[in-house]
């Protein structure tokens, strides 16, 4: 069954108590490595939280439901200079969140899966934020309502990709305009950007 993080090592030691000594020693070494990795992760996470806490751009981006410290910092680092994008709607394409377009001389054009071009870490962070907004956040917002409509019409995976693309546009717009998120923010920008759900 499920074992709490704090009780994991104790449970493993209990299981290997009567095992072969060489096998038990190798497991002990792996437990030591695991503990060191977790401690290092926790230290790095505390540093990240301090960086975000003192960064006005990250704090602004975190006003969007589903966007936490890691997502905010990943997006800021990935974009670097927001003014290099003339239009907010192009940011999603930069991170590979727009559908690929298939063309031939004899058939009708159609859109496929997202292109997955650009920085994969930023794309994954945006998708994680989109999934959090749709599946965990309960507070209403125009952006969440838009995503849930796509989920009902198509699938949750399509909705996550579409909301991630929209988030890229919204986060960029907020950054450039120095505007915090509000629950109706997605309504106007949805209409203006005319984004299509990913396939």
What spans do the regions from the language model cover?
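Phosphate-backbone recognition surface of nucleic-acid-processing proteins
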Residues: 60-63, 69-156
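Conserved acidic
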Residues: 29, 33, 118, 155-159
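Short alpha-helical linear motifs
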Residues: 51-56, 94-101, 111-117, 169-171, ...
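Low-complexity, acidic/Ser/Thr- and charged residue-rich accessory regions of DNA metabolism proteins
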Residues: 106-110, 144-199
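Intrinsically disordered or highly flexible coil/loop and linker segments, enriched in small
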Residues: 21, 43, 50, 135, ...
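A residue-level signal for conserved active-site and pocket-lining positions in enzyme catalytic cores
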Residues: 37, 126, 167
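Glycine-rich, often acidic, oxyanion-interacting loops/wings at catalytic, nucleic-acid
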Residues: 1-60, 121, 164, 185-193
């Amino acid at each position: 069954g499920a074992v709490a993080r704090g009780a994991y090592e104790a449970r493993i030691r209990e299981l290997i108590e009567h095992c072969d000594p060489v096998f038990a020693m190798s497991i002990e070494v792996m437990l030591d490595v695991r503990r060191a990795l977790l401690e290092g992760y926790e230290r790095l996470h505390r540093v990240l939280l301090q960086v975000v806490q003192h960064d006005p751009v990250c704090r602004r981006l975190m006003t969007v439901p589903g966007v936490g410290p890691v997502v905010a910092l990943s997006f800021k680092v990935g974009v670097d200079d927001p003014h290099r994008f003339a239009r907010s709607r192009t940011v999603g394409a930069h991170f590979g969140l727009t559908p690929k377009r298939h063309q031939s001389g004899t058939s009708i054009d159609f859109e496929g899966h997202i292109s997955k071009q650009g920085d994969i870490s930023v794309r994954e962070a945006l998708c994680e934020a989109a999934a959090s907004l749709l599946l965990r956040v309960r507070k209403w917002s125009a952006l969440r309502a838009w995503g849930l409509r796509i989920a009902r019409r198509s699938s949750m995976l399509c909705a996550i990709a579409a909301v991630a693309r929209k988030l890229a546009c919204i986060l960029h717009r907020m950054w450039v305009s120095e505007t915090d998120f509000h629950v109706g923010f997605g309504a106007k920008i949805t209409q203006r950007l005319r984004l299509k759900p990913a396939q």
